[in-house]
Amino acid sequence: MTTKDLDAFFTKGWNGHDVDVLMTFMSEDCIFESVAGPEVCGTRHVGHDRVREAFARIFTAFPDVHFRDARHFVAGDRGVSEWVFAGTASNGKRTEVQGCDVFTFDGGKIAVKSSYFKNRTA
């Protein structure tokens, strides 16, 4: 996995609103740890099908989701992407928040995507 690959993951997959493209970057036994949920890690989605469902729910919750100002770093089998998440929720509330993903790679694919973002009060 390279910084160019991570850029394509965000521009073609997330900003293209294309779950199929996103999943081409994920390993078959991938894990997505979302920002919110009952577990210490948020909510842990395990396996290709569960991760696909979780990604699709993000597009449903924020139909105009867009990641901007992304910067990507890769060192061996680990990587980080910093970004600004922007989107309008189905209730009309606009969200813009700075965040990052911490990645673990395996075989040139994303094995773990652990997401974090700031907790804005306004």
Model-derived segments and their meaning:
Residues 4, 19-71, 76:
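A solvent-exposed, acidic/Ser-Thr-rich amphipathic alpha-helical stretch
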Residues 66-68, 95-101:
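Short, surface-exposed coil-to-beta transition loops
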